[in-house]
Amino acid sequence: MGCGAGDRPAWNDVPADGGADVASEVAEAPLALVAVTFNTGTSGEVIAGRAIPEGGYGPAQAAISDAWYGNGLAWPPLVDDTAAFLAEVDPDLVVFQEIFWSGACPEIPDDNRTGFVCEGWSPGDPTVAQTLVGAGFQVACHVGKPDKCAAVNRRLGVFRGCDADLCLEGLFGTTVSGCGRGARVARVVIELAAGGALTLVNVHGSSGFDPPDKACRVRQVDQVFVDLGDGAPAASGHRNLVMGDLNTDPGRLADFDPSAARWLDFVGEDRGFHWVSPIGSEVPPTYAGVANIDHVVSDTLRGDCWAPTVTAGHGAFTDIAFFDHLPLVCTLSE
């Protein structure tokens, strides 16, 4: 289910006055939930110098992943490990970036399917995102970007206007001219089972630190807080939750990267939005051991976050060298 990459789905309308049916968004009880943001991609550098067990994920698999799978999560043992991790966390909401879209399997030659999720794949099979979260969830992805998706547990609510288990373009967004195709910032409204609604924004900022990359990210931050392309900010509901991979570190890079500084224009204790995830130079890095680029932001929800291997009491969930990001798990409440 989808629409063209610049069209606005009527079923996901958010009024330009900044309130997505504001009267209906006041919940009958304070909202509490567990949310996860996870960039499930990889890069060739992750396995450099690592001992690779026989039959494991090594340089040959990494080359195929890069050439055919967009370096997204498509290696079945890792899918299994990640699904087990999420089952243990038992989240209400998950947002993914760089997750392989199984609908691309027909484009992949047979000899590059062996050992990956496309081996034995058939149309109608669950997507990787659906496999990770399991039964009881709806999954929806960005307009023009099926590698960026959100999943909501039906016990929390359902995506507005999405009646299926999978709505391929269920998150509305627009392309930023000159910054690639498809929506890297996208919005969906969740109709809460307890009453009211929550506006969810999934962010995957453009990567790189050349001037054009930074400029793209500035414009993407503006999509979140100024205008998504339909006259309203992405975060334009009565209550908003913004999650994802910013591809910059506002706590470390604001003096160097204008896109990091732009986040601080809108997010802080003296701003309309606040950081739920920790920021700052003393925060243990969750990306490649060097930075914190995966974040959670809200205007009404507060809470605490943790990440495997960097937060005390939370060990690794896989022994396979693949991910350069760690998942961020946040317990939130109003």
Regions flagged by a language model, labelled:
Residues 1-2:
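C-terminal motif of bacterial Sec signal peptides marking the signal peptidase cleavage site
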Residues 28-30, 86-88, 131-134, 143-144, ...:
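Extracellular/periplasmic catalytic domains that process cell-envelope and extracellular macromolecules
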Residues 93-98, 136-144, 236-237, 277-279:
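Surface-exposed patches in mature extracellular/periplasmic domains of secreted proteins
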Residues 40, 99-199, 203-205, 304-311:
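Structured beta-strand-rich core segments of catalytic domains in phosphoester-bond hydrolases
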Residues 34-40, 78-113, 151, 188, ...:
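Active-site beta-strand/loop signature of hydrolases that rely on acidic residues for catalysis
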Residues 6-19, 23-131, 198, 218-221:
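N-terminal, active-site-proximal structural segment of metallo-dependent hydrolase catalytic domains
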Residues 48-74, 102-130, 158-179, 211, ...:
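Surface-exposed intrinsically disordered loops and tails
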Residues 228-241, 248-334:
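Metal-dependent phosphoester-hydrolase catalytic domains
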